[in-house]
Amino acid sequence: MTSHQEAPSPLDFIRQDVQGMHAYAVQESRGMVKLDAMENPFTLSHELQALLGDRLGAVAINRYPGSKVDDLKGALKSYVAIPAGCELMLGNGSDELISLLAMACLTTKDKPKNTILAPLPGFVMYEMSAQLQGLDFIGVPLTTDFELDETAMLAAVATYKPAITYLAYPNNPTANLWDAGTIRVIIAACRAYGGMVVIDEAYQPFSSLTWLDEIRSAPVANSNVLLMRTLSKFGLAGVRLGYMLGNKTLIDQIDKVRPPYNVSIMNAEVGLFALHHKDVFANQAAIIKLERERLLAALTALPSVTPFKSDANMILVRFKDANAAFEELKSQGILVKNVSKMHPLLANCLRLTVGTPDENTLLLKALGSEPS
């Protein structure tokens, strides 16, 4: 009788934790009113499309990115009025910056494995980057009204001394701005042992506040703070551009693990184009903020629906039955994000992206808030 041994497989060399993971799933959205991914819903005018096409057609795509990326960094520094003593680095979206931070902070001389800490529910990439790079991740639940639990956060900071503490401002998916006083206390607690705090301002174009003002007014107190933003919500989600600024000494070290030419020359050209036409995107953001208030008012008037305050281009809404509401909207051609299983605090919650005025009217009609 011949015994059959299982042949060796290349999968044996793939990490077991990776094999146990699920790839990030993107919902099928063709033919739908797409209100699931916090994208800017506005397209460029035909005139701007033609101008951008001319610029991209003239790009030397046979050459590696070089001075064009430097031009973009310079333009972004001017755009944000970067504070003295700060530097800025670019990423292929903020996702790459999150990965680079984890890579740079994996181990130190005193700790074989460092820790990343973040409030939950929050952006999934904080935990995923820690897992993929081999760091420990500690999640600290928010309060029931989605505020930072100062006592729990400070206890976690004291216990684990995380290399990086992420604070989204405003948060995803809850869309709220956390109390600035609480954030200052957390930053100070991390600074006491040298820990970094990353303020993620992905939704800054729609927010009433920015932590950049704090960095300017109190540079020493924020010397351990890195500010991260993306141009996705600016209107360039398809381009993949993110940037991070902070103390030059810190940025210079993290920039060492960035792959060369991580931002393509085409992406850099589109970024420069967008900054040149920043007023167009600012006007789009203004419309989105007005529409957000219209949606909030209409949703508040609906029975059995609880919308939460938003400083982003999304609204978190609690329904009596989120799964039923999600399927009903989908049956009417409207795609939103069902976040009800992401965290116990999000039970029966859907996240609605603020769309164009017409898209938002369709959403409200589907929810029974607008006459057919």
Name what the model sees in each region.
Residues H4-E96, L100:
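N-terminal small-domain helix-loop-helix segment of the aminotransferase-like
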Residues L35, T165, D200-A202, M228, ...:
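Structural scaffold positions in well-ordered secondary structure
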Residues S45, N222-A301, T306-F308:
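PLP-dependent aminotransferase class I/II
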Residues A60-R191, V198, Y203-A221, Q284:
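Conserved core of the PLP fold type I
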Residues L245, L316-R318, T353-G355:
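Short hydrophobic/aromatic beta-strand micro-patches
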Residues I288-K289, L299-G333:
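Conserved PLP-binding catalytic core of the aspartate aminotransferase-like
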Residues S331-Q332, K341-S372:
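PLP-dependent enzyme catalytic core of the Aspartate aminotransferase-like
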